[in-house]
């Protein structure tokens, strides 16, 4: 018997799911504050650059977890029933409905504290939340 693949035609739900998976993979569901901070950064990037959320959700230059060689890449396939994934999903929904306060003061870039990308070498971060540094 062939598996049945159900196509979700509701693009908003698809984008919500993709963003939730990215937020989960980047934060590993560590805390609500971390999920809110990353969602705030995504919203800021969308609003300040007019980039579409589906494009942001798949941008490997923003999210290290999207790279196949990333240690966090496997987390993109987390079980949707996990409580920490569900927290990320709810946070993304709040962001997409405009119900999330900007906890990163307008930041549009981030990296995790254990990494230092070249673009951040001479930049000053404006917020540190959940092991992530946020920049304008």
What are these regions (language model features)?
Residues 2-136:
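Bacterial extracytoplasmic/cell-wall-associated proteins, especially those involved in peptidoglycan
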């Amino acid at each position: 018997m062939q598996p049945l693949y159900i196509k979700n035609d509701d693009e908003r739900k698809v984008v919500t799911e993709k963003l939730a998976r990215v937020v989960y993979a980047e934060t590993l569901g560590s805390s609500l504050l971390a999920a809110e901070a990353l969602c705030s950064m995504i919203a800021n990037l969308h609003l300040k650059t007019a980039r579409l959320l589906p494009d942001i959700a798949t941008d490997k230059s923003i999210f290290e977890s999207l790279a196949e060689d990333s240690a966090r890449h496997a987390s993109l396939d987390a079980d949707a029933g996990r409580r920490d994934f569900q927290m990320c999903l709810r946070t993304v929904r709040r962001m997409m409905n405009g119900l999330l306060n900007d906890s990163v003061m307008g930041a549009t870039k981030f990296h995790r504290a254990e990494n230092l990308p070249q673009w951040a070498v001479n930049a000053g971060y404006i917020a540190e939340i959940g092991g992530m540094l946020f920049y304008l």
